Amino acid sequence: MGRSRRTGAHRAHSLARQMKAKRRRPDLDEIHRELRPQGSARPQPDPNAEFDPDLPGGGLHRCLACARYFIDSTNLKTHFRSKDHKKRLKQLSVEPYSQEEAERAAGMGSYVPPRRLAVPTEVSTEVPEMDTST
């Protein structure tokens, strides 16, 4: 038995890091900012939404809570019943970490437990389908 060469093994770590960065999704505080009712950046369902060929389903069916795009409304509704979506809604129900909470943790105040926020179960930017039954 001879000695085997392991060429190219040192590149696997950097490739894994690149793929991890590519699949990175927005953090919870960024999603909270989008879901805020008074936030001007909150996307609303737009019947005249522009079709984006780079996104699944043209970017028309999106779950805001999970920051994912879906091919059609059927897959989006199936996603609403999935374990991943329910887990993300549970994470979003806790108030995001703030500077005041960081100061209290450092001993500059008394502990106040984080508030529970009401998150709608079906958060999406789904565009209503056109009715062609005439």
Curated annotation (Swiss-Prot):
Gene3D superfamilies linked: Classic Zinc Finger (3.30.160.60)
Biased composition (Basic residues): 1-25
Sequence ranges of Basic and acidic residues compositional bias: 26-36
Principal location class: nucleus
Expression sites (tissue/organ): Ubiquitous. Detected in spleen, prostate, testis, small intestine, colon and to a minor level in thymus and peripheral blood leukocytes.
MF GO annotations: DNA binding; preribosome binding; zinc ion binding
GO (cellular component) term, any one: nucleolus
Compartments it resides in: Nucleus, Nucleolus; Cytoplasm
Domain of life: Eukaryota
One record GO biological process: negative regulation of RNA polymerase II regulatory region sequence-specific DNA binding
Keywords: Cytoplasm, DNA-binding, Metal-binding, Nucleus, Ribosome biogenesis, Transcription, Transcription regulation, Zinc, Zinc-finger
SMART domains: ZnF_U1
Family to which this protein belongs: Belongs to the ZNF593/BUD20 C2H2-type zinc-finger protein family.
Function description: Involved in pre-60S ribosomal particles maturation by promoting the nuclear export of the 60S ribosome. Negatively modulates the DNA binding activity of Oct-2 and therefore its transcriptional regulatory activity.
Entry comment, domain topic: The protein is largely disordered, with the exception of the zinc finger domain.
Protein name: Zinc finger protein 593
Organism encoding this protein: Homo sapiens (Human)
